[in-house]
Amino acid sequence: MNVKRTKKAEKRVDTSYLSSLGIKAYGHNNLYPQEVKAIIEASPNGSTCVERRATYIEGNGIVSQVLADTVCDFFGATFDDLHHLCSEDMAYFDGFAIHINYNAFGEIVSATHIPFENCRLEEADENGYIRHVVVHPDWSGKTTRNGKAVKVNKDNCDFIDIFNPDRYVVQQQILSAGGVQFYKGQVLYITRSGKNQYCVPIADTVLTEMSGDEAVSNVLCRNVRNNFLPAGVLVTKRGQSSEDDDIGFAEDVAKLQGDMNALKILHIEVENDESKPEFLPFNSKNYDKEFTATTAKFIDNIYARFNQEQFHRLRTGAIGFSGDLANDVKLEYAEQVTRQQRMLTRAYKAVLEHWTPNTLPYNGMEDIKIEPLIKSVTNGTN
């Protein structure tokens, strides 16, 4: 079958124009990053893979410890803090955003992390040029300030210039804003699709599996927490009947549900005088084995998408438990995230090369290279 005859796949992310906000939507409801993160965080295996990916992308931090400990914004955050947050966004979204502030001379004076999910791109002009990154604290409109919801409208959005450290450009932007005190700065917005481009993170292709992973976990949890788990039923002769018998029986049954009430005995009284006390074993329906194959497939696909199959095999003992083998697996994965680390390093370089002179302990590219987790791997401590 050729391409023409195959069933066409749906577009993964809708980027239609939202005229009310002047932006390109990120997803059909403009909440694609938020929904991706929610699905990942609800999936036991998906969140494990992303957290591991973030740890390895962050590595042991940038090489220069002096620079790492230096405050880089007006909120007291250090470069190490900035690197940590950008690494986490890279793990979740394969992109990150940094807010850049300048002085009146067009020199950078601060760099602050912006949550990637808070950023949207302005619609391109007739020349295809995107001029602003649009930032809102919560595109779902649920965040409140002083007890009032922060509505999603232009008044509550910050339209911030795209990163361009050229001193002349910066000074012209400052003049247009009415002075440095009114200037909103710039945003460095980078994804694996390039600068100022929405991207589809690698997690996108296994969102179905991660959603299913959450669902199976819920079923198994309910099986343990809410299932009917008595050890058996004791049948005895009933005495004088009461109007409250039916209500009491229903309450007794409810008390036998869940793990905290497992292995108790349900007592039932019958009206037949000839009935003798009898104990009847009670076997409840267990759903654990119903999803064994499904769960295994979900896990395999999730770990494979994040290139972490060896970690899963190591965890299950499929390839043994030796310390050397574990170190080899960790070392291999540390090498796999070098592409993401280079993206971060290039971004830091673009910022630091235009920083206010003689205010940072930055001496060149070697200072901002990211140290991989090789030392931790060698010591077997990670």
What residue spans do the PLM features occupy?
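Generic structural marker for isolated residues within well-ordered, non-membrane alpha-helices
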Residues: 68, 299, 349
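Structured, contiguous alpha/beta core segments that scaffold functional sites
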Residues: 2-48, 54-61, 65-271, 381-382
